[in-house]
A protein has these predicted regions:
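N-terminal leader/auxiliary helical segments
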Residues: 1-197
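Conserved acetyl-CoA-binding loop-helix of GNAT-fold acetyltransferases
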Residues: 267-269, 275-292, 311-315
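Conserved GNAT acetyl-CoA-binding A-motif
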Residues: 290-301
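Short hydrophobic/aromatic beta-strand or adjacent loop that forms the aromatic wall/cage
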Residues: 234-236, 337-344
């Protein structure tokens, strides 16, 4: 194991604005008290830990902050054991464990007292009611709460010099290397997760009226799938106000690698009609169509600098999964975009 503060450094690298449950999840697996049980919950008893982690990732909803933190913890410990612990053992004569634990204590204490957000984060974690915790394999909520309280006190009470082996430079390099590696690994697992979700498309559906009394969606095109281009079926609507066009919105039916970045819903509101929340309202009017096609979760993506579109997603209650780098094979990359906000909107 790497130590709780180092796990929090990794969590901050992955999601600097992540919710408090994500951070708690990122240390939760160490609430397992028995070392033999901890080896099992950390997959150390398995020949292939990577396969177990992949299987867990495919069962983990990207919108579940706590579970996402747990997954990150287990992935980081797997890489730490290989890149840090095992290398340490090779260089130590005799009993390595006590020396290893000492160096970990030094590095974790130093990180706590030399990271500007650490003290406040630990206080927030301790203050959160344990009833909000997610599930920690092998540990109770009481054990997790105790872990947080004990270690918050320990970090505050112990201000140590940096480790001479796990130096701040070593830790920074490890966090950056494994953090970037994890992000690419996790994005691929998220794509596989969404691609496994149910969808029901036999044909396009006609709806008599899609209106909330203020705006109306008028279907202008139903675009069949183009399998050779990996394009899914799509609806194209005009957003109308008093029978006059106010914008456009489209809905794509299905899940593909490309739609992870491109999203299921795209919208634009004509300039003279902006500022009235029409994009959000139009998205909500699509709900019966989304449900009719058996989809419970849709992705809405936007350029990471597009504040207005991001605000629309937030008003919908969509969950920001991550800011994802766009791969070179995607059309968005060819259009000059490099990062997309990936939002998940649950329509249950």
């Amino acid at each position: 194991m790497a130590g709780l503060m180092l796990h929090l450094l990794m969590a901050h690298k992955i999601k600097p604005k992540g919710g408090i449950l994500f951070y708690i999840g990122s240390i939760a697996p160490d609430a397992v008290a028995n070392w033999k049980d901890k080896d099992i919950t950390h997959f150390r008893n398995l020949t292939d830990r990577s396969e177990a982690l992949e299987n867990l990732a495919l069962q983990t909803s990207p919108s579940d902050d706590f579970a996402e933190g747990v997954l990150l913890h287990l992935y980081m410990d797997w890489r730490w054991d290989t890149l840090a612990r095992d290398e340490f053992i090779k260089k130590i004569d005799g009993d390595w464990f006590i020396k290893y634990r000492k160096e970990l204590s030094l590095s974790n204490s130093y990180a706590f007292h030399n990271t500007d957000w650490a003290k406040n984060l630990w206080e927030q974690m301790e203050l959160l009611d344990s009833s909000e915790y997610g599930k920690t394999p092998g540990a109770t909520v009481e054990e997790l709460k105790d872990l947080i309280c004990r270690n918050n006190k320990w970090h505050n009470d112990n201000n140590m010099e940096p480790s001479t082996y796990f130096t701040p430079e070593f830790i920074e390099k490890f966090i950056n290397q494994v953090g970037d590696e994890y992000t690419q690994w996790k994005i691929q697992r998220e794509i596989e997760y969404y691609n496994s979700l149910p969808v029901d498309f036999v044909d396009f559906i006609d709806f008599e009226k899609l209106s909330d009394g203020e705006i109306e969606l008028f279907c202008v095109a139903k675009k069949p799938a183009i399998p050779e281009k990996k394009w899914v079926p799509a609806y194209d609507f005009e957003i109308r106000k008093n029978n006059n066009r106010a914008g456009r919105i489209n809905l794509r039916i299905g899940y593909t690698d490309g739609l992870y970045y491109g999203g299921h819903i795209g919208y634009s509101v004509d300039e003279q009609h902006r500022g009235h929340g029409y994009a959000e309202k139009a998205c909500r009017l699509l709900t019966p169509i989304i449900k009719a096609h058996g989809m419970k979760k849709v992705l809405i993506t936007n350029n990471h600098t597009n504040i207005a579109s991001k605000r629309t997603c937030e008003k919908l209650g969509a969950k920001l999964i991550r800011i994802a780098p766009i791969p070179e094979w995607h059309d968005l990359y060819k259009d000059g975009q490099r990062f997309e906000n990936i939002f998940e909107w649950s329509v249950d």
